[in-house]
Amino acid sequence: MSRLRIAFMGTPAYGAASLQALVDAGYQVCGVFTQPDRPRGRRGKTQPPPVKLLAQQHGIPVYQPARISRDGVDDFRRLQPDLAVTAAFGQILSQELLDIPRLGTVNVHASLLPKYRGSSPVHWAIMEGETKTGVTTMMTDAGIDTGDILLQSTLNVLPGETAGELTLRLADLGAKVLLETVEALEHGHCPRRPQEEGLMSHYPMLRKEMGEINWSGSAEQIARSLRGMLPWPG
C-alpha cells in the first residue's frame, strides 16, 4: 500500500469511478469531500451523492460542506493530505485550500483541455458535433480548468452516443489516467505543460431550461442537442 495520503473531492458517478480506482490501487484515501445531500427525482426525495455512498462503503470519512473554501478548510487541513484529487466536485477551491497538499491538487477533467473548460464538457462536446474527446489530468489552480496539463487520453465519440453514455466511458478512462498521474507524481516524474490559451474554449453550466430543443435548426443540430441533453436536462 502506498503511504501517500489522498484527500478526494467529487460528487456524481463520474467522480466515484476515480475514487474506486484509488481505493482498488491501495492508496490511502484519508477523507472524501462531496456536495450536500439534495432532493432528486420527481418526488424530490433527498438523496446522497454517489461519491458519498461509495466512501461510506469503504469506511472513508465523509465531509459535506456547503462551500468547502469557507466551511471545510479546517477539516481539510486536519487530514494532512499529501495530494488532493478532484473529479466533478462542483465547487471552486480557494488558494488557501490549494496550498495545503504538498504535492498539489489534481483534477480529472472530461475534455481535452484547453477545449471545453467548464462544468458540462461532455454535453457540450456532443452538441458541438465533436467526433473525438477525452480526459485530462491537470494541476488545479485558482482559475477554472486553467492549470497545467499532466496527462491526456483520447477516445472517439460513438455514432448516436448520448451524454450519459459518453460520461460513463470517460469516467472509466479518467480513472485509469488518474492512476497513471498519481503514480508519476508520487515518484517525482510527471511532466507538466501550460495550456495553450489560443486553443481555449469555455462553455457554461447546463441549466434546466436549456433542455428545450430549438426545432428550427437542422436535423443534425436537433439530433446533437437531443443526444447532448440526455439524460439531463432533456
Q: In which residue ranges do the predicted regions lie?
A:
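N-terminal Rossmann-like dinucleotide-binding module
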Residues: 1-43
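Short beta->alpha connector loops
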Residues: 11-14, 66-69, 89-91
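Conserved beta-strand segments of alpha/beta enzyme cores
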Residues: 28, 59-61, 104
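Amphipathic, non-transmembrane alpha-helical secondary structure
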Residues: 16, 20-24, 73-77, 179
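N-terminal glycine-/serine-/threonine-rich beta1-alpha1-beta2 phosphate-ribose binding loop
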Residues: 35, 39-82
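Donor/substrate-binding cores of folate-linked one-carbon enzymes
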Residues: 25, 35, 83-202
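Internal anion-binding site segments
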Residues: 2, 197-234
